[in-house]
């Protein structure tokens, strides 16, 4: 497989279930670190039953602060066949999951689409990505009902510095608008769980208050009906010795400024977190459960 899926278009030759030589480090077959019921997503995704979450390894971004560093950078996980992936979807459904939640699926969309051709459970499928999704990728994502995309940066310099992706702002905003045009609006069931729709996540970073305010403005102008999730759970991970300015938690003042601005924005659907929402308890064990 010569890969040009993600916006990096590195042209890597991804083979079978070995280690890939492309930017994401992924082989052709999906590498999974965990597949289990998960309760740590937004309330309209995670309920008392849990979200059937599949954590894919490797990543087309290289965020220096990634809290899933163990799998995004170090490729911890196990390669599975398309048939096995379909079986995992079925097992999660039979375990009572309210949805199938695909975390960081961008670089495996071809295999995922094939797996859903074998078996697609009668529950919503959540495409949960970092937002660095090309149109070529999204054209393959006909299986998704809910799009949960990050909008990490609107500042090209910060995107380059912390994720080595200067084009991230344009790629992510275009991806969000494409997903918005597909779903057209949000649909919830009688329990408040999203059946169809768009959630935009923004992780507030140290010294990132102005960026967060810009994200709020962008959402208000372009997709005011989307659910906006303003996250305070930034937890410094990985080696941040070269980035001391983000090697800390965000402050109460930083988060408070963002929340005050959001409250005045007029956006109706906003999720927030307690400032205490951080630490290893927000990082699931990547122990190959369910793989």
Model-derived segments and spans:
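Aromatic-anchored, glycine/proline-accented short structural segments
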Residues: 134-192
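Short low-complexity, flexible loop/linker segments enriched in glycine and/or proline
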Residues: 116-117, 141-142, 163-166, 284-289
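Conserved Radical SAM active-site core
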Residues: 20, 24-147, 155-157
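Conserved radical SAM core fold
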Residues: 72, 109, 132-134, 151-169, ...
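Hydrophobic faces of well-ordered beta-strands that scaffold small-molecule active sites
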Residues: 52, 100, 125-127, 147-149, ...
